Structures are given as structure tokens and as C-alpha cells.
């Protein structure tokens, strides 16, 4: 099934030298033909002495199981006791302390009867928590003021351009908890988070997931907050951590029902677009500051019950054509209540011909439980992004991950995980390389307070890898497009640096790529509305931050 969306691939025609300054030479267009993946990046490698050493850390490919596998490191990393008494819902990775390790914020629904929380040693409902990361594990940050609310989602971003990551949280506003606003920014002060006041953010919003983008290209990061009351909002950053509702002014309707959100340039004009999971509507940028609703009929789902909802979304290129594709997860109660089997869905970006639902052709079988959270990430670093879900496999003990097996024509094919059938699922499962071994780990958010949320260490046998980040002088690169190519040749992967993945979850602003057997790649960076920056001959197996590493 196809639906026409005006999608033209961005012609990346300007060349840059390896030190990030614009040069006089020119490269051929990258991705100008959606059917071609041949592209050449030329110039001098970016090395120490030119742009400075951009390498933050390195790690060789890891050994382990050939199948995607995990070990439970929750207790070993100190994440059991601090998270008791929680109806977990929101989880956000981000480096708040500036030590280049991912810290963890977890939000909870604290509005139930106290007795419900009194399990696993908890005295009652816990507030939202911030866990700070160190090499040996996590410690509870007691500087975070207690907040008891229905915290549903969140994301990190440098919202005041002071060089560190702030936190924005969204909540289902509850009249019984008037102190907890629907959207709130917590300013980062020396690694501690402090709630802002007089921010102009909506107080009574039924907030869910949070998207971050600079939709008007004014250098200030804006917010798109989904709402399950049909009033999702676009919030323009006015500076000074003050925001204004720009929904109508940007051409967006006021009735957008949403649970999840994904931002990314699917139209190829160099500007970020917005996909809202829930009502499954795509809004395409038609220039800085405004959007047009695209024909979104291809994203229509069949429902089996009143409590069936569409939840998370993820955007990345899954077939190496340079176009960003969309995966969508579900929160279908009919799977656990009525025995329905419902797949997460995959939509290929067909350029000017719109999107095509390739779920069945890709081998994405129905799930017997909810799969709210989805991510397109390469979990074994073989060069192909896998489809991560928070449905369970392995008899309910591991996340269900569909392993990318390569292309059938231009359609990706996935193998289903073993052990599907258990009703266990997790609300969210944001990824991060917690132990710096080049493999993405997962934090699985548990809604039931009688069970723990889980930190799952990736122990899969790994190919080569590369992580690309951008420094605070460029807003941590949120919205930047990152491409990796074989040296002088074909496209291996393309994605944008985003801080929103899946459902109710946030990730650090890092683009992760598996490289398979490649030990060196060419990298191309493009800021929204900007010119390409070429970094040829980049060694694999490193975390790289442009332009000056991790001081």
C-alpha cells in the first residue's frame, strides 16, 4: 500500500575539507538518486592538528553469542533499590554531569493507592528519580526535588544554549496533583536539575512523548509534546527557557492525538519533519517555521478493541537508499485480553512516491503482547539496523528484537526472535552504550511495581562500530544528519542525531552505526538547513565527537 507524500531526497552537493571548514573542491551528490547508494567523499582526514582529536574513546568489537543476547545487570549496576515503589513509564538517557557517561532519569505514575507500591521493600510511592552514572554503576542523585506525578515521557536538550543538557518532562496532568505541570523543564546547573518557573509551558496538558527540533532554524531548540487528549503542541523556544505555543502559527492543527513522536527529515529538504504515533500523522516542513500535513493514509491500522493504541516511533534508513524510514510500535490491549497477534509496522520511504507498508514482506510477524517501544538500531553491529521492540521473547525474560538479515531487492528482511508468546512487555526500552564497549544496551521500563525495571547489557558478538556525536557549540547536533560510507564508496547507514526514540523515552544525542567488517569509513555530517561537513577515512571502533572530542 502506498501513499503519496512530497518527498525529494536532499542533494548534498557542497564539499568541505576534513577540518570542517568549507573548501573549494566539490563532491558528487550523495543520494541524489534514491536507487543508488554509490557516493564518494573526498578531502583530508580530520586528525589531531587539524580539527583536534575528535576521538573520545575506543573499544574493539566484542565477543559473545552469535544471536542477539543480553545479561541482566540491574543489581550489579545499582538500579534495584533506588527504583522500588515505581509505576515506571518514562526513561531518559543523557549526560547531565559532563563526564561523557549516560545518566538515567526515570519517571513514574505516583497517583495510585499507597498500598499498591508497598512491594519489594518499598514504603509507598517513590518520586521520579535521577541516577548518575559512573564506571562501576549508578548512584541516586538526592539533589533532585521530589515530584509525585504521572510522569509519562521526557527528553534531553540544551534548551538555554549554555553548553549542558537540560531535561524536559511531560506528564498526564492530574487535578489531584496540581504542583506537577503537564510539561516542565529542569535546568541543568553543574549536573543538578532544577525545575524552572514562568516558562510559558502548558500546565494542564495530558503530555506523553517529547520531540526536540529547531523547526524555525533560529538556533534555539523547540519542543513538540504529544498528548492523548488530542491537543499535542509545538512549543517555540523564545530564549531564557521561556516557550510559546506555536502550533497554529506553524500550520499544525490543534487536534493532534499522539502518544509517540519521531522527528527527522523524511522529505529530503534538509529540514526536520514530525511523525506523530497515535493518530499516525506526518507533518512535513515546507520551510523554516511551518509545516504541511501529508497524506498519511498509508499509516492507517486495524484495531481490535477500544483500548488498542499506537504508541512509539523510530526513524532511520533501513535499506541504504539514503531515505529515512519509519517503524511504529503498538499498545494493543487486545493482544493480552483477546488473544490478538499484532506486528509492529515498518514503512519504507519511497521518495516522491511516498511511504510503503512493508511489514509483512519484511517478515515482521504478529506479537502476542504489547510492543509499545520501537527502535531502529544495529544491536550486533553487522551494518544493518535491527528492529528493537519492548515486547518480550525468551519466555518473557528478554526484549523481542527482529534481526536484520539484509535486503530482498530493496526491502529489508528480518528474522523473528525465539520465544515469542509470553504476555510480558515493557513500557519503554531506550538504548545507550552504558559500558563503552561499542554495543548498545537497553533499559527496560517496568510498569508493575512488583517487578523491577531492567538494565540489559548487550553481550552479542559484534562487528566494528562507530558512534558520532556533536559538541555543545552546535547544540549537541540534535537534528543533524549523519551518513557513513565505505571509503570512497557506497552508503552504509544514514540517520539523524535525535533525543527521542520509541515511546515515552529519551536517548542521548548520539548516532550509532554498526560497520560489519569495515575498519574505516567516510563520515558526512549535515546540520538542518546547512552544508555538508566531510570527515574521510575515520577509523572504526570509536566514539567520535565533532569538532573537538570530549574535553
Predicted regions span which residues?
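Calcium-coordinating acidic loop motifs
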Residues: 94-97, 101, 134, 157-164, ...
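Ser/Thr-rich, Pro/Gly/Ala-heavy low-complexity intrinsically disordered linkers and tails
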Residues: 13-62
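Hydrophobic beta-strand segments that make up the repeating blades of beta-propeller
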Residues: 104-108, 167-171, 223-227, 274-278, ...
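Beta-strand-rich domains and repeat architectures in extracellular enzymes and scaffolds
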Residues: 77-113
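Repeat-based blade/solenoid architectures
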Residues: 78-91, 144-155, 199-211, 251-262, ...
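Gly/Ser/Thr/Pro-enriched helix-cap/hinge segments flanking short amphipathic alpha-helices
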Residues: 77, 81, 291, 410-551
